[in-house]
């Protein structure tokens, strides 16, 4: 089958968006310390095998609704040190998500349904860590 890339980190490269042409075999993608301002719907489409996504230290203000739904196996999401004003939509639907870094953003309000699914009997993994300090 040849080689397949599992881990990729592109840091301090002045990226303004998530590259759409990286290998879809990636399990870990770290794009920290760039200039990414938004996550749009199709940005994560090909990265369905990711279990760790690092987007800390960017300028992300907006995460389009539904864009995280392409990451069904995601366990860790690093969105610290950005410019988010609210918790991204769709976190409760990521059933394996355990760690969410949202510290050092501009989040002023956290809703009761921002992290947990609505309704009884909906199964998901327990969170090991959610960071919201310095908002």
From Swiss-Prot:
What compartments host this protein?
Secreted, Extracellular space, Extracellular matrix
Quaternary structure annotation from Swiss-Prot or TrEMBL: Homodimer. Forms a ternary complex with MFAP2 and ELN.
Q: How is it modified after translation?
A: The two attached glycosaminoglycan chains can be either chondroitin sulfate or dermatan sulfate.
Q: Which residues are glycosylated?
A: 65, 106
What GO cellular component is one of the record's annotations? extracellular space
Entry-linked Pfam families = LRR_8
Free-text tissue specificity from the UniProt record? Found in several connective tissues, especially in articular cartilages.
Q: Where would I find the LRR repeats?
A: 4-24, 25-46, 49-72, 73-95, 96-117
| UniProt keyword terms in alphabetical order | Extracellular matrix, Glycoprotein, Leucine-rich repeat, Proteoglycan, Repeat, Secreted
Q: Which gene encodes it?
A: BGN
Instruction: Give the protein name, as stated in the record.
Output: Biglycan
Q: Which domain of life is it from?
A: Eukaryota
* Stated family: Belongs to the small leucine-rich proteoglycan (SLRP) family. SLRP class I subfamily.
According to its UniProt entry, the function of this protein is described as:
May be involved in collagen fiber assembly.
Q: Which InterPro entries match?
A: Leu-rich_rpt, Leu-rich_rpt_typical-subtyp, LRR_dom_sf, SLRP
- This chain's source organism reads Oryctolagus cuniculus
């Amino acid at each position: 089958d040849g080689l397949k890339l599992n881990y990729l980190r592109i840091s301090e490269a002045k990226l303004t968006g998530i590259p759409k042409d990286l290998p879809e075999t990636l399990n870990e993608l770290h794009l920290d310390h760039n200039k990414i301002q938004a996550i749009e719907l199709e940005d994560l489409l090909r990265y369905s095998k990711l279990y760790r996504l690092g987007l800390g230290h960017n300028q992300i203000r907006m995460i389009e609704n539904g864009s995280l739904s392409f990451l069904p196996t995601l366990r860790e999401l690093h969105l610290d040190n950005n410019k988010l004003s609210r918790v991204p939509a769709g976190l409760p639907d990521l059933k394996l998500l355990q760690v969410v870094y949202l510290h050092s953003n501009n989040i002023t309000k956290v809703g009761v349904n921002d992290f947990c699914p609505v309704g009884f009997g909906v199964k998901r993994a327990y969170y090991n860590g959610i960071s919201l300090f310095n908002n």
